[in-house]
Design a protein with these regions (language model features):
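A charged, aromatic-enriched C-terminal amphipathic alpha-helix characteristic of glycosyltransferases
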Residues: 27, 380-407
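Membrane-proximal helix-turn-helix segments that form the acceptor-binding/catalytic region
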Residues: 96, 145-199
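Conserved donor-binding/catalytic core segment of Leloir-type glycosyltransferases
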Residues: 200, 228, 233-251, 257-261
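Carbohydrate-associated surface elements
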Residues: 205, 227
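Glycosyltransferase donor-sugar binding loop
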Residues: 244-247, 268-281, 294
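Nucleotide-activated donor-binding/catalytic signature segment of Leloir-type glycosyltransferases, i.e.
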Residues: 280-302
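Short hydrophobic beta-strand element within catalytic cores of glycosyltransferases
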Residues: 310, 334-337
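Conserved acidic donor-binding segment of nucleotide-sugar-dependent glycosyltransferases
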Residues: 349-362, 370-376
Length: 412
């Protein structure tokens, strides 16, 4: 990028439109928050429009970062369809002023109805994909009705949507409503994404899948890894393991339970993202057990991390970029993860990461036993090497430069 282009990108006004923002949501929302923060700290003017929650101000400002919180923006159980109908926001004076201010509009989640509005105002749009929504209506590209990664190109199986919603605790009416909406409108969402000037994927694995299903995006689809949060190493005080994926079968909770039945020696798993009053405690015949916690604030996560030396990531879907993996390595933990999605890219070269084929619970059980038998000194040494390798490969300054290049392309 030449000096003039660099100065132009440096002075850009960037508008993020996202239904949720960290600390709400999951990995995609964390990535959006980190991007907004990173760009603001490097001198760009950044505005974010998101949903409001109790005790949060309607507007907050810190340096170059300004956040506007609108009521009930993401109140629907099916957020992507709720947002499609928010014409009261899209056609408001408030929104027109934001678009007039912006040089570039970024869509990091499901607010795709804003894409044609921004284009009508002559604003370039960057869509940031954290799942597979353009090629899969439930964004996972995993068919739970057949228990395998979906291979249905350009089609949508109602049985897949039904299985997905049931697995995530939806009742009959919610399941039928989701099936109807997803089957009827997901092709419309594809068309909206195609209007984007650039599409950013967060791993090579994700980009390859998206392009294979939508060749029309090939020339505008870029790979930029997510920025990393600033996390310090946490001292290891215990011999337990952690699982932070909640009850979702896509995150591999069923695989973990199956594996623990084959673990010969006792192991304790700290599992977050559950309703403790409903889940209680699972005790296995070998005296291994799972202790359940609800979704916790970062300070309480750190307390749990002190009791663990290894984080388990047994996902069965092709997760594009695993923040659980990244945070575990940055905080000085070993990782046992399935070889699926973008995770193998993340952990490449890390000596303290142990991988198994997705769904292979017997191999997972063997790895749990192997790691649990390692000495504390060996665990700490491997964890330190993990962090060193990881930080050399993933650098926030580098990913910022890569995003600047995309901003320069769409800004012309």
């Amino acid at each position: 990028m030449d000096l003039d282009a660099c100065m132009k990108v440096k002075s850009m006004n960037i508008l993020f439109l996202t239904e949720l923002l960290y600390p709400h949501g999951s990995g995609g929302e964390l990535a959006t928050y980190l991007w907004a923060q990173l760009l603001a700290e490097s001198g760009r003017k950044v505005r974010v429009v998101t949903s409001s929650f109790p005790s949060e101000p309607e507007r907050s400002e810190r340096g170059n970062l300004e956040i506007f919180r609108l009521p009930t923006l993401g109140a629907s159980a099916s957020v992507k369809y709720c947002l499609l109908g928010r014409f009261d926001v899209l056609l408001s004076n408030f929104f027109r002023k934001l678009l007039a201010w912006a040089d570039v509009v970024c869509i990091p989640r499901f607010w795709y109805s804003a894409i044609p509005v921004a284009k009508a105002y002559g604003k370039p749009v960057i869509t940031h994909l954290h799942g597979y929504i353009p090629v899969c209506p439930v964004a996972t590209l995993y068919d739970l009705s057949r228990n395998r990664i979906c291979d249905s190109h350009n089609s949508c199986r109602p049985s897949c949507i039904i299985a997905h919603e049931k697995a995530h605790g939806k009742n009959f009416l919610e399941t039928m409503g989701s099936t109807l909406l997803n089957s009827a409108t997901w092709r419309y969402l594809r068309k909206l994404v195609e209007l984007s000037d650039s599409v950013i994927c967060v791993s090579k694995a994700q980009r390859d899948i998206i392009i294979a299903h939508m060749p029309s995006l090939t020339r505008k689809c870029y790979l930029i890894y997510n920025p990393l949060p600033e996390l310090s190493e946490i001292e290891i005080n215990g011999r337990d393991m952690g699982y932070f994926g909640g009850p979702s079968p896509l995150k591999g909770f069923n695989v973990l339970c199956s594996a623990l039945r084959y673990v010969k020696n006792k192991v304790t798993i700290h599992a977050t993202g559950f309703d403790p009053s409903k889940q209680g405690l699972i005790q296995f015949s070998n005296k291994s057990r799972i202790l359940f916690y609800e979704r916790l604030p970062q300070s309480l996560y750190e307390q749990i991390h002190k009791e663990t030396h290894t984080v388990l990531v047994p996902s069965i879907w092709a997760e594009p970029f695993g923040y659980v993996v990244a945070e575990a390595i940055l905080q000085g933990r070993l990782v046992i993860a399935s070889k699926v999605g973008g995770v193998p890219e993340q952990v490449n070269g890390c000596p303290g990461v142990f991988s198994f084929e997705s769904g292979d619970y017997r191999h997972l059980a063997e790895l749990i036993e192997y790691v649990n038998d390692l000495s504390v000194e060996t665990i700490r040494d491997l964890a330190a090497k993990n962090r060193e390798v990881f930080l050399k490969r993933f650098d926030n300054k580098k990913v910022e430069q890569e995003l600047m290049s995309v901003l320069d392309v769409v800004g012309h």
